[in-house]
């Protein structure tokens, strides 16, 4: 054990010396990085004792339906909202969907991007209640320059938009535990953003946290910019202020699509996030069971700003470290990350709120884009609202082949988005394209044979069909 400690010390000393010479990042970033790596090397990650896990009670994970209605008085509503800040995590690129630049500028519906919809929502909120809810965007070094240009188009809106960067940390070369940028990798590939757990120190280091506190702001609503369901909810805000909860995680019931999502547990008297990576191998199936662990983290988080300041200043936010091994130009590297949801256990009176599924509508792939661009949803004041004509509570399951993976290819294969209000499942593979006015119902599978181009004609109605060629339509 002593030998391992010595090895860890020499690793950290070598890394510290090399990082000190990196001119691209601030002293705060260097200190944060070294602190993260030291925690990782000390192996302080505690194993969860499975027998100590308890299912949270309704006091800890509050059912949304039991929340008190917000005040009806407009002045009282304004007073509540004036304590709020909205923060969107804007560090991700649209590369997985074949787009360049920040993911938040992908067009979602009616020509509006994720960012457009967010701005329209907050504008209508500020106008309706006469309040001043600011929007913060946490960028990464990957999205910063593009985002700065993009937000200029909102300069005439009635909202204050602040941008700040999350930390930039060097990737570590696995072989000798030195930073990749100090070994000649001068481009962006030498660096990484260390996960959204970094939102708390970065908010503080940027000076934004002090500014917001001086303006009388009390809570920040943090959400992924690609979650179209993450809209301001006055009922939740009212509950947190009334009960002085320093932290709230929105959770929602698991479906079979969400079995890998983190869940909330009661553990040694505190509420905490349990991720699949922390689960001992022999309990993974139990973790995935919808019977025992019924809820998962939406990553919609509401956090008290004074509490963030207190905990960041005390360096108390020691979230579980997620090691993420990668390869850059054939070199094996390690990046260490943390998640914002894991911070829940450090805050006082932390709770979960079990919210309707409508508050979790992420767009991670073109199959999600098909859902939100279809007649399953409508757009009102920037809000994506579910069509009441859909009887089933769950959305249809949609699987699109690799031909649809990139947004440009996806759009080229649909003359118009089909009607899917009565669809249960859709599976498409091969060279398939859709005409306009197509209606899909029940369970539909469309598989074009290799080398065959399959076109679904205009106005086709497909109900419970298995299509392998034009003769099956």
UniProtKB/Swiss-Prot annotation:
The keyword NADP appears for this protein: no
Gene Ontology BP, a term: UDP-alpha-D-glucose metabolic process
Binding site for substrate: 91-92, 196, 224-226
Enzyme class, spelled out: transferase
Gene Ontology MF terms in the entry: UTP:glucose-1-phosphate uridylyltransferase activity
Record function comment: Plays a central role as a glucosyl donor in cellular metabolic pathways.
GO cellular component: cytoplasm
Keywords on record: Cytoplasm, Nucleotidyltransferase, Transferase
CDD domains assigned: UGPase_euk (cd00897)
Major location category of this protein: cytoplasm
Stated name of the protein: UTP--glucose-1-phosphate uridylyltransferase
Binding site for UTP: 89-92, 103, 166, 195, 226, 364
Catalysis: reaction(s): alpha-D-glucose 1-phosphate + UTP + H(+) = UDP-alpha-D-glucose + diphosphate
């Amino acid at each position: 054990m002593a030998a391992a400690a010595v090895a860890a010390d020499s690793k950290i000393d070598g890394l510290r010396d090399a990082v000190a010479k990196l001119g691209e990042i601030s002293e705060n970033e260097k200190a944060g990085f070294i602190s993260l790596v030291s925690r990782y090397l000390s192996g302080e990650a505690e194993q969860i004792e499975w027998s100590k896990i308890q299912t949270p009670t309704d006091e800890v994970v509050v059912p949304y339906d039991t929340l008190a209605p917000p005040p009806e008085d407009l002045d009282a509503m304004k007073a509540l909202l004036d304590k709020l800040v909205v923060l969107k995590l804007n560090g991700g690129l649209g590369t997985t969907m074949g787009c360049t630049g920040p993911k938040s500028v992908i067009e979602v519906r009616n020509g509006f991007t994720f960012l457009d919809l967010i701005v329209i929502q907050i504008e209508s909120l500020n106008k309706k209640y006469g309040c001043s809810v600011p929007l913060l965007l946490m960028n990464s070094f990957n999205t910063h320059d593009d985002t700065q240009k993009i937000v200029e188009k909102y300069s005439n809106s009635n909202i204050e938009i602040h941008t700040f960067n999350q930390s930039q940390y060097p990737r570590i070369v696995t072989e000798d535990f030195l930073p990749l940028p100090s070994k000649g990798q001068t481009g962006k590939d030498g660096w990484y953003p260390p996960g959204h757990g970094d939102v708390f120190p970065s908010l503080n280091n940027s000076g934004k946290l002090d500014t917001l506190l001086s303006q009388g702001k009390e809570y920040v609503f943090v959400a992924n910019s690609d979650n179209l369901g993450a809209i301001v909810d006055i009922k939740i805000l009212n509950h947190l202020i009334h009960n002085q909860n320093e932290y709230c995680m929105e959770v929602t019931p698991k479906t079979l699509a969400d079995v890998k999502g983190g869940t909330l547990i009661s553990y040694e008297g505190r509420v905490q996030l349990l991720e699949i990576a922390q689960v001992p191998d022999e309990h993974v199936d139990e973790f995935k069971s919808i019977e025992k662990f019924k809820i998962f983290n939406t990553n919609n988080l509401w956090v008290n700003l004074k509490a963030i300041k207190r905990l960041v200043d005390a360096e108390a936010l020691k979230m579980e470290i997620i090691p993420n091994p990668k390869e850059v130009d054939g070199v094996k590297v390690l990046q260490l990350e943390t998640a914002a949801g894991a911070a829940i256990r450090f805050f006082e009176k932390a709770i979960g709120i079990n919210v309707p599924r409508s508050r979790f509508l992420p767009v991670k792939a073109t199959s999600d884009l098909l859902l939100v661009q279809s007649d399953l949803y409508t757009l009102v004041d920037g809000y994506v609202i579910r069509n009441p004509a859909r009887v089933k509570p769950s959305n249809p399951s949609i699987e699109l082949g690799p031909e649809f993976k990139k947004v440009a290819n996806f759009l080229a294969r649909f003359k118009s988005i089909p009607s899917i209000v009565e669809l249960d499942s859709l599976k498409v593979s091969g060279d398939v394209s859709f005409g306009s006015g197509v209606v899909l119902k029940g369970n539909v599978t469309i598989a074009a044979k290799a080398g065959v181009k399959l076109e679904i004609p205009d106005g086709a109605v497909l109900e419970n069909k298995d299509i392998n060629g034009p003769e099956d339509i």
